[in-house]
Amino acid sequence: MNLSLFAIALGGAAGALARFWVSNGLYGWLGRDFPHGTLFINVSGSFLMGFLSVMMIQRFALAAEYRAAVLVGFLGAYTTFSTFSLETLALFEEGSLLKAALNVLLSVVLCLAAVWVGAVLARRLAVGEIAALVGGPGLRIFGAACGMSLLAGFAAALAFARAGLGPQLESLVLVALTGLVVVGTLVALVVTGTELRGAFQLWGAFTLSAFAAVVFLSLGLVLARGAG
């Protein structure tokens, strides 16, 4: 069997399972009144496509089999345009025209923005402009932010199950937790002496910490739902 085909099949299986777990976890938490799960899947997948395509093709020049497994297999199965189309059609047919239009607008704008941000961050990393953020204390700080976000998401899901706050209040709590993680990360970078030179590095630190907070908070929520 062609090695690239095997790599694509393996990556595709992992991507499909990841999409199933993440989207179902989000739908179980937020409900199915709006396609939150598919939107998150496509936006996060677009970011990873932009970031990893630059890193794997332009910077490290990995073998075709590795690129095929990740970019074609995993991300191809993880993201889903067909589900986005079906969910949007369902919203139109049930008369939720505003939700359908909002889903189209958010999906197009956020996915394009995410793939651009991912590609730009990867290119800046390649020329060393964000090296200070992931070297020395910066790496430990971002690692701690990821761990704290995971624990916060897990604890929040358990608290939500007991308190019964409702989707709106739960969303506000998660936005507040995300803000705390981002602010705490930036403060820790400054306190430990990590040099943020120029607007791009400051913006890069904000983007990385916000992305890490959202991803690991969501992962904690999904894990807690699965454990429950």
From Swiss-Prot:
Na(+) binds at G76, T79. It is a multi-pass membrane protein. One of its GO terms (cellular component) is plasma membrane. The keyword Coiled coil does not apply. InterPro entries: FluC. Keywords: Cell inner membrane, Cell membrane, Ion channel, Ion transport, Membrane, Metal-binding, Sodium, Transmembrane, Transmembrane helix, Transport. The chain crosses the membrane at residues 3-23, 37-57, 72-92, 101-121, 141-161, 172-192, 202-222. Na(+) is not transported, but it plays an essential structural role and its presence is essential for fluoride channel function. Its main location: membrane. Fluoride-specific ion channel. Important for reducing fluoride concentration in the cell, thus reducing its toxicity. This is Fluoride-specific ion channel FluC.
